[in-house]
């Protein structure tokens, strides 16, 4: 019947049921369990089902109503606006391994209303909601909900919600290893929000969160005037058109702990998006973070307004960074801020658009693969690589207001067959530090030692003042080195200093290549010395002999190399024939050479083995003939 109850405890009464309690209730506005006005219900184990619009399976009601349900219990509700497990200014506790389910438009599997409402759910709970506008866990206006570790929460339906904390001081805490899956257009995984003029709500998750949201216009995390704190090692996945991984607006804040990964896929997809119409919104990366966006017209980071920053450590300015792996573009709008300290081994692949906002990138021992024209407000390039060759052999321009750092490299595409065809760096304000420009020829002609002669005069960088310095990195061809030289030209018309390609010198390292010929000559020279001994010392020199010798050759400077070796030789010879006109000696030897070579780029080993046959003939008038054969 409509408005009926299964079990009710009120006015201090207590109901205690041992064993399994099974309750089925049907009818609009009906309730399976209700405890109100200090009433208490204790069930060791229960299976409760309520069917009907606006039904509630379990309700811990106002004025101190309390309900305790043991582990391995099932609570289900079905109908429009139905609630499975609910507390309205009362207390409800459910044990481990619970199944809590609600089906219907606007249905809530777990619902807390008003201050003093508290719900606690044990480990490994399965919480399910199905229907348009349905929610798995919902805390409203001061209610507190605590879901222990290893929970699985799902919501399925248009505009469905996985977890919602709404209005004044509502708070939800999720334990470690929580899994949340939400499906439907307009769906949201975690939603913390409030109405204007009220205190915001909070959602806190433990470590190892798995959050998956699917549907057009869907969002992984949504915070407006509310706060969401995501624990370490979370994985957030969102797919569909016009989707967002993390969204913060109108004083909404989201903090992402260490080793969080956000993956977003679809048309007009955003990894992190901040926006506000009044006070600021923010997303703070408090440790290592991966943001992967697969979208032709989306962004990895978009601060339309508000801020996306590295770790603030409780302050208002960035205090520390992290190792970031970011695939996708960055953009800021008016008053928008992106401020990241990209620490060792960070990789950013994408382009940037500072617009009327502020993008600050501090790179230390990191890589930025630039995929198109980009603008940055502040950039530190400290021992990092900015690779502008990732734009499909196009020519891109990187414009930076303030550039600093030391030991950084900027790799530029260049067409070596014509002048003024290259990537370009422009610094519009301050320029400090020492930076290296490295050139990559786009026509795959690195093996051509004449390459670059027609590119003289190409402007590679233009700076508006400052005492920074660019140097060119030498290039390595297959059999040659290229030394690039830069020079500067001050233009009175635009007040910029232009760094251009002055000359290219091609060097053939023949000195190093000649090392092999040198060692071969030294090997033969040893045999010639031995035959000289035979000619001068005759019978006393013949017989077995051993020689060991070593040597080193090389050069210093820009294209230095070093080659060193040790040669071992063992032989035997004797007099072969003697007449009144000449004396002939012959012998055989085995030689082994062990060497190593090191060059400015690369190294190698040199080894040689040979069997040598030799004859020397000395005439009685002083002439001689030496013959050597090698195998």
Give residue ranges: language-model regions:
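Primarily extracellular Gram-negative trimeric autotransporter adhesin
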Residues: 62, 114, 347, 367-375, ...
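Glycine-rich beta-solenoid repeat tracts in large extracellular/virion proteins
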Residues: 5-11, 31-37, 56-62, 82-88, ...
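Outer membrane beta-barrel translocator domains of Type V secretion systems
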Residues: 504-631
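Beta-strand-rich solenoid/repeat architectures in extracellular/passenger domains
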Residues: 1-3, 14-29, 40-54, 66-81, ...
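Short, solvent-exposed loop/turn segments that connect beta-strands within catalytic domains
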Residues: 197-200, 278-280, 579-582
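Extracellular beta-solenoid/beta-roll
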Residues: 280-284, 292-297, 302-436, 440, ...
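Polar/charged side chains located within well-ordered beta-strands of beta-rich proteins
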Residues: 17, 35, 60-61, 73, ...
